[in-house]
Design a protein with these regions (language model features):
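N-terminal entry segment of cytoskeletal motor ATPase domains
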Residues: 1-177
Length: 177
């Protein structure tokens, strides 16, 4: 019922932080990632959809790319220039809101969602929308302790989560009485 006080009991609730916040370990790994703004790119791949690569040579409308990540790692191939897309700087890896990405293309969106999923960060914003990638596992992110993280916080003050959306909706509803 609206306006009802909920008692927050955190005794048996596990810490949701590893499933909500980008850890220092992840940030360190991202900072060490090699990146060349002129050569780093994504290219299409039949199974993985996109692979990261480095542009080695451009000849007219053809681009020679050495794959640096994925099942083709180490392989060099030639692609049409329109199929080669730019990679965001590493500081945008595991980005909480994809509307902040420098290069907003299919590969960048899929890469960011995949990276967050691998790190067990299943919620991501895309502007006004909250994207959830279902891990088909139970994470301790729907507990009273997690509710406490999001209670009375604005969406930009906490990591992406459906509770942030709910809190914003509740706050707006209370203001528009």
């Amino acid at each position: 019922m609206p306006g009802t006080k909920i008692e927050l009991k955190t005794g048996d609730d596990p810490d949701p932080a590893p499933y909500l916040f980008v850890s220092d370990e992840i940030k360190k790994r991202i900072a060490e990632k090699p990146y060349d703004p002129k050569r780093s790119c994504y290219v299409p791949h039949p199974e993985e959809k996109f692979c990261e690569g480095m542009i080695e040579e451009t000849t007219g409308a053809k681009v020679q790319v050495k794959i640096v990540k994925g099942s083709w790692e180490g392989k060099t191939d030639t692609f049409k220039q329109e199929l080669v897309t730019q990679v965001n700087p590493p500081k945008y890896d595991c980005c909480e809101d994809m509307s902040n990405l420098t290069y907003l293309n299919d590969a960048s969106v899929l890469f960011n969602l995949k990276m967050r999923y691998v790190e067990r960060l299943i919620y991501t914003y895309s502007g006004l929308f909250c994207i959830a990638v279902n891990p088909y596992k139970r994470f301790p992110i729907y507990t009273m302790r997690t509710v406490g993280v999001y209670r009375t916080k604005r969406r930009n003050e906490v990591p992406p989560h459906i509770f942030a959306i709910a809190e914003g909706s509740y706050h707006s509803m209370c203001l528009s009485k």
